């Protein structure tokens, strides 16, 4: 499969998608969002892939949306076409998806990272939602996912003042899971992804669904969902293999069955 705006690589059970619009600092346009989804479609269908990674360059994960593409849009056009509906599909993926953010993760780039299940970032990372300076608001989940990640006060401040959040603060407030040097970021992210991919994909997907459910329902309903998922894994061969391997003190070999 050939792409114009991304690179796709598969290794050790991990699918790596690298944004590749260097002259535009990986600014998100319709073509890029479309190709990300095509790559994710391919990775989700590939039974050898157990985890996916979304990365950019050292200078920029993605510095925002492509303003030249958006400047001439009209309300009837974007409303009737459901503009950004393709972006929503990124957050709806079932396999685990990790963002590796180095440099700028601004505007749509910040929102793209927030669509992933968790974020690893480099020590030079900068996150922000500066849409208000353009006379608009975040449009692919920024007001919602950022608030869930860092709380109302910081989300309000970042969106209303366009302040950029650096790596250390991002980790402290829960926006990112871990920080690495920019030289080590991709290697460390791939190691984590390979570790996830080596486990039962069925169980990984159920964990992802269960944690996401915590943001959608009350505690009682979330607990019921988790309990049903827990019961369900006992219908899999991976559960039998995992527990038998533990008893026998050996490495488990999961087959996603």
Segments (PLM) and residue ranges:
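Terminal peptide-recognition signature
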Residues: 17, 21, 36, 54, ...
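Terminal low-complexity tails and localization/encapsulation signals of metabolic enzymes
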Residues: 1-3, 244-257
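Glycine- (often His-adjacent) and acidic-residue-rich active-site loop
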Residues: 34, 45-48, 56-92, 105, ...
């Amino acid at each position: 499969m050939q792409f114009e705006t991304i690179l796709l690589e598969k290794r050790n059970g991990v699918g790596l998608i690298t944004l590749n619009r260097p002259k535009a600092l990986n600014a998100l346009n319709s073509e890029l969002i479309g190709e990300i989804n095509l790559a994710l479609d391919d990775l989700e269908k590939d039974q050898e892939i157990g985890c996916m990674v979304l990365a950019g360059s050292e200078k920029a994960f993605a510095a925002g949306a492509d303003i030249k593409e958006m400047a001439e849009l009209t309300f009837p056009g974007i409303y009737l076409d459901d503009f950004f509906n393709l972006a929503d599909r990124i957050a709806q993926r079932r396999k685990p998806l990790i963002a590796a953010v180095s440099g700028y993760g601004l505007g749509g780039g910040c929102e793209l990272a927030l669509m992933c299940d968790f974020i690893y970032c480099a020590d030079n990372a900068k996150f922000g939602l500066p849409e208000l300076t353009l006379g608009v608001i975040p449009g692919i989940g920024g007001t919602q996912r950022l608030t869930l990640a860092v709380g109302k006060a910081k989300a309000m401040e970042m969106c209303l003042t366009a302040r950029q959040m650096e790596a250390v603060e991002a980790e402290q407030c829960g926006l990112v899971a871990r920080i690495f040097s920019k030289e080590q970021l991709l290697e460390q992210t791939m190691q984590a992804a390979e570790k996830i991919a080596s486990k039962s994909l069925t169980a990984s997907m159920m964990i992802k669904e269960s944690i996401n459910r915590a943001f959608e329902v009350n505690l009682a309903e979330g607990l019921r969902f988790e309990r049903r998922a827990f019961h369900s894994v006992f219908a899999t061969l991976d559960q039998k293999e995992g527990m038998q391997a533990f008893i026998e003190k050996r490495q488990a070999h999961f087959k996603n069955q």
